[in-house]
Amino acid sequence: LMGIAKEMIAGRLPMVVGTGAIRTEDSITYACAAKNIGADALLIATPPYAYPTGREIALHALAIDREANLPVMLYNYPGRMCVNMDEETLNRLGRSSNFIAIKESSGDPNRLHMLARDYPHIGLSCGMDDQALEFFAWGARSWVCAGSNFAPEAHKALYQTCVLESDFTKGRAIMSAMLPLMRVLEQGGK
């Protein structure tokens, strides 16, 4: 599938490949396969079902980084993985310049503030559709979102308005119109 995706993208956009697996060894295999087909970056989440500590998450991600040596977007989604990529994790990962971004999907505004203030070297990416405006206000430069798959024009308009034009008054109006869709996307049971 990675090869097919790479052909379809044909260099028009960066290709980011997820490496999620229970075992670090399997994540490394996926990451190396991604590198071999020409992926531009990796998406690394916490291993599912394992409930790792911050140290264990960092060791997992650093092992993948050592083998693949590609830019990495971390994926923090404690609502699904039941653990947070905490400060211990982020501090340990700061040892490698490959950890360039984090898709933050905790839903916790305090965590957004902490990431923006304390980890400016890790680019913020919004992972919660209904919090895009807040993320953009705090400096996020990207948004990895489900809704863009079926409402791309509205998502592009919000990004253009907030990130490129810094017009948060207009951005609030766009986001307000999008909120009914966002509520559906962020509700439980998906």
Say what each PLM segment does.
Residues 1-82, 92:
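Active-site beta->alpha loop and helix N-cap motifs at the rims of alpha/beta catalytic domains
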Residues 66-67, 78-188:
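Catalytic alpha/beta core domains of metabolic enzymes, predominantly
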